[in-house]
Amino acid sequence: MIYAQILAGGKGTRMGNVSMPKQFLPLNGKPIIVHTVEKFILNTRFDKILISSPKEWMNHAEDNIKKYISDDRIVVIEGGEDRNETIMNGIRYVEKTFGLNDEDIIVTHDAVRPFLTHRIIEENIDAAIETGAVDTVIEALDTIVESSNHEFITDIPVRDQMYQGQTPQSFNMKKVYNHYQNLSAEKKQILTDACKICLLAGDQVKLVKGEIFNIKITTPYDLKVANAIIQERIAND
């Protein structure tokens, strides 16, 4: 089976003084998360669409989805303490509710990236079926510098080998779950990217080309950019 998981577990601290997590903030009259989920319900290959929310915001998430979307594939579940635990909670839910087989895949995506495309989703599904681990990326436009002490440059990687990670990130569910369980508690705590779980296990991670406009709405500036993107699309329709 093919599952989607919308990662809506963040609290949005970088958005400033707002009354709710950033995924529920309005974007052109609808919550950001609704725009994102709408992209996934258009794809008929998904058997279920999981929305992972902070426990205290689950009812709010359900109310927002029901207000704008009618699709019985959608289910709201509780997120985890961090990004990777949220993904693992999704896999545990699937295992408990539907059972897992060796071919099941999951396409995980930030709730606050509402501009992903059908192509990106399709290529993630196909690559996950083929390889078991996928990351969506764009080429790095700026030179990347590395600083181990946060004061002086320690390295400048070759730019044409550098990419900026986006989402979706997609996985064979059994593989990524088993790899995660084999990590030490210390490694689990410092890992911030799910694809690194697979890399540490020696798996190859396939790259899927993202889009510059597949932005993550994290700050007030990002929200202004997102509104501008939508207004431009409305004007061009």
UniProtKB/Swiss-Prot annotation:
<keyword id="KW-0961">Cell wall biogenesis/degradation</keyword>
<feature type="binding site">
    <location>
        <begin position="7"/>
        <end position="10"/>
    </location>
    <ligand>
        <name>CTP</name>
    </ligand>
</feature>
<dbReference type="GO" id="GO:0071555">
    <property type="term" value="P:cell wall organization"/>
</dbReference>
<comment type="pathway">
    <text>Cell wall biogenesis; poly(ribitol phosphate) teichoic acid biosynthesis.</text>
</comment>
<dbReference type="GO" id="GO:0008299">
    <property type="term" value="P:isoprenoid biosynthetic process"/>
</dbReference>
<dbReference type="InterPro" id="IPR029044">
    <property type="entry name" value="Nucleotide-diphossugar_trans"/>
</dbReference>
<dbReference type="InterPro" id="IPR034709">
    <property type="entry name" value="TarI"/>
</dbReference>
<feature type="site" description="Transition state stabilizer">
    <location>
        <position position="14"/>
    </location>
</feature>
<feature type="site" description="Transition state stabilizer">
    <location>
        <position position="22"/>
    </location>
</feature>
<feature type="site" description="Positions ribitol 5-phosphate for the nucleophilic attack">
    <location>
        <position position="159"/>
    </location>
</feature>
<comment type="function">
    <text>Catalyzes the transfer of the cytidylyl group of CTP to D-ribitol 5-phosphate.</text>
</comment>
<dbReference type="GO" id="GO:0047349">
    <property type="term" value="F:D-ribitol-5-phosphate cytidylyltransferase activity"/>
</dbReference>
<dbReference type="InterPro" id="IPR050088">
    <property type="entry name" value="IspD/TarI_cytidylyltransf_bact"/>
</dbReference>
<comment type="similarity">
    <text>Belongs to the IspD/TarI cytidylyltransferase family. TarI subfamily.</text>
</comment>
<keyword id="KW-0777">Teichoic acid biosynthesis</keyword>
<dbReference type="Pfam" id="PF01128">
    <property type="entry name" value="IspD"/>
</dbReference>
<protein>
    <recommendedName>
        <fullName>Ribitol-5-phosphate cytidylyltransferase</fullName>
        <ecNumber>2.7.7.40</ecNumber>
    </recommendedName>
</protein>
<dbReference type="InterPro" id="IPR018294">
    <property type="entry name" value="ISPD_synthase_CS"/>
</dbReference>
<keyword id="KW-0808">Transferase</keyword>
<feature type="site" description="Positions ribitol 5-phosphate for the nucleophilic attack">
    <location>
        <position position="216"/>
    </location>
</feature>
<dbReference type="InterPro" id="IPR034683">
    <property type="entry name" value="IspD/TarI"/>
</dbReference>
<keyword id="KW-0548">Nucleotidyltransferase</keyword>
<dbReference type="GO" id="GO:1902012">
    <property type="term" value="P:poly(ribitol phosphate) teichoic acid biosynthetic process"/>
</dbReference>
<dbReference type="GO" id="GO:0050518">
    <property type="term" value="F:2-C-methyl-D-erythritol 4-phosphate cytidylyltransferase activity"/>
</dbReference>
<feature type="binding site">
    <location>
        <begin position="80"/>
        <end position="86"/>
    </location>
    <ligand>
        <name>CTP</name>
    </ligand>
</feature>
